[in-house]
């Protein structure tokens, strides 16, 4: 795991060449076919030589949830072990990592009807309405979630609505379900002490994405697929900002600056 442009894929490839491992992607966007440039998906040549599980598995007509990722990952761990290999998870979707490690077995499936009701409430109220609602229902979880992190706020409210339990309670009560009790887990985190250099790499990569056709890619995906309002790609870094640009909400300069800012968080 590590921040954007920190060299996760390169390190994973080096480890693949040296050890008896299989790579499993931990990325909420790379799992979708066609979402290539904006997700910095490895090229077809790289994927051919260094296969990644959970890359190009889903159509954008589908919504791939955290619960599905955890279920798929647990199955893959068993399959990889059956081949006498070690699974190496690589990616930057921290919610996926945390959910897999801490356990998500007790969390309910998504409720699209309830989510739509929340979005209607948000549209009729101010931008922080959902966060304030979460704060009233689960202060402990609200304190660790950013007020603009709509995805996690909606999920927490959904859990409360479905189970009657707070998300903070669910996480704590699920601590005995973690992978740490079943497997020997080694976590590798890439930490770049030179933040200025890291930010420069992020900026360069975003420039390359735009030159390689990020806007054209997103335009093609939006025209081809009917994306539900809750679809993860609509809130994904690079895709969210490009869609806003295509809708005329921001100009190209703002697209770059907003995507750059989001990538640095």
Give a label for each model feature:
Residues 1-264:
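Phosphate/pyrophosphate-binding catalytic cores of soluble transferases and nucleic-acid-acting enzymes
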């Amino acid at each position: 795991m590590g921040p954007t442009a920190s060299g996760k894929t390169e390190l994973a490839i080096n480890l693949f060449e040296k050890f008896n491992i299989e790579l499993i992607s931990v990325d909420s966007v790379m799992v979708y076919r066609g979402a290539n440039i904006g997700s910095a998906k490895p090229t077809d040549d790289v994927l051919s030589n260094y296969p990644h599980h959970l890359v190009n598995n889903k159509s954008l007509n589908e919504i791939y949830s955290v619960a599905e990722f955890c279920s798929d990952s647990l199955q893959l761990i068993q399959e990889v072990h059956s081949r006498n290999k070690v699974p190496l998870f690589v990616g930057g979707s921290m919610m996926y990592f945390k959910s897999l490690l801490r356990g998500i077995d007790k969390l309910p499936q998504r409720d699209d009807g309830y989510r739509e009701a929340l979005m209607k409430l948000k549209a009729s109220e101010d931008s922080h309405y959902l966060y304030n609602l979460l704060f009233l229902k689960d202060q402990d979880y609200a304190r660790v979630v950013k007020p603009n992190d709509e995805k996690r706020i909606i999920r927490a409210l959904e859990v409360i609505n479905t189970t009657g339990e707070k998300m903070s309670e669910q996480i704590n009560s699920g601590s005995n379900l973690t992978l740490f009790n079943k497997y020997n887990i080694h976590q590798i985190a890439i930490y770049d002490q030179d933040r200025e250099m890291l930010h420069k790499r992020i900026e360069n990569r975003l420039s390359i994405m735009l030159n390689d056709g990020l806007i054209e890619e997103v335009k093609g995906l939006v025209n081809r697929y009917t994306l539900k309002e809750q679809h993860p790609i609509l809130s994904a870094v690079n895709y969210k900002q490009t869609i806003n640009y295509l809708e005329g909400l921001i100009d190209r300069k703002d697209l770059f600056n907003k995507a750059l800012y989001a990538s640095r968080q």
